[in-house]
Amino acid sequence: MSSSEAFPVMQEIMLEFRAGKMSLQGTRVVPDARKGLVRIARGDEGLIHFQWLDRNQNTVEDDQIVFPDEALFEKVNQSSDRVYILKFNSDDRKLFFWMQEPRAEGDAELCSSVNQYLNQPLEFPGEEGLAAAITEELEDMAEDNTSSRAGNLVVPNLSSEVSDVTSSSGPVKLADLQRILNNLSGGPVGIAGDQDEGLALGDILKPELIMPLLEALPVQERLSSHLPEGHSRAEDILELLQSPPFRQQVDAFTYVLRTGQIDLTQFGIDPSKYKFTVDSFLEALEDSVSTQSRDAMDES
């Protein structure tokens, strides 16, 4: 399989240098003898990729998405050779490389450049389009019944929640949606504190949590217009949720939300009333649903 088939296409190549990769075998780090290339690039989704390529095959073998301040590239001082390590502070990943550039004098400068590119602020060329698409989606949600809205909010222990919510023949009521959000936040909606900053959209958009909704609520019909023709089955949706491009977009949205790089007013959200956390963002959506439901009742 070629790299273009296995990995996303890069929008911009920021840095490349020749380096082989190494593998950890017990307590020893063993070099891979192949000619390699380290590439720092920006993907179409706006995220920074740290890649390793086999130079002879011109194929990408390793592709790591790195967020600012998530990883450090540095020399392994315990080795007398030109060995470097990319280590992540978010988990226990440690990737080793050995320099193949002819001049060792340039290693320090390359190391500095790697860290500079990995830790620069993210840029999202399509952010305005993404925001517009999500805003349109929210507007459409306002016209639907609240069962469709609840289908996008997934929480632990959801099976029991869904069975309760769907026990009647009517649509999901606002109180049901509020109860789901209460379980998500670990307390009454509206009390979102700093402890909620650890919640990511990826934590709630998991296949094992989405499946009960696909089985109990009319979510598939709601999503079918956004999926390729003939790919709107529950299995297709679950496959999409696990695909690298989707997970990358979810991680990217979580990141720009947490760091305040997104304009909440584009979603009809007053930033003075909510925090830049996933939990607070969901709370804002719940408040929007509540307001729109009241307006609909007043009109009727």
From Swiss-Prot:
The keyword Nucleotide-binding does not apply. InterPro entries: DEUBAD_dom, Rpn13/ADRM1, Rpn13/ADRM1_Pru, Rpn13/ADRM1_Pru_sf, RPN13_DEUBAD, RPN13_DEUBAD_sf. Its main location: cytoplasm. Residues 192-295 form the DEUBAD domain. The keyword DNA-binding does not apply. Residues 9-121 form the Pru domain. GO terms for cellular component: cytoplasm; nucleus; proteasome complex. Transmembrane segments: none annotated. It comes from the Eukaryota. Residues 13-120 form the PH domain. Disruption phenotype: No visible phenotype. It is found in: Cytoplasm; Nucleus. Functions as a proteasomal ubiquitin receptor. Binds and presumably selects ubiquitin-conjugates for destruction. Prefers multiubiquitin chains rather than single ubiquitins, with a binding affinity for 'Lys-63'-linked ubiquitin chains. Belongs to the RPN13 family. Interacts with 'Lys-63'-linked polyubiquitin chains. Interacts with DSK2a. The PH domain mediates interactions with ubiquitin and DSK2A. This is 26S proteasome regulatory subunit RPN13. It comes from Arabidopsis thaliana (Mouse-ear cress). The gene is RPN13.
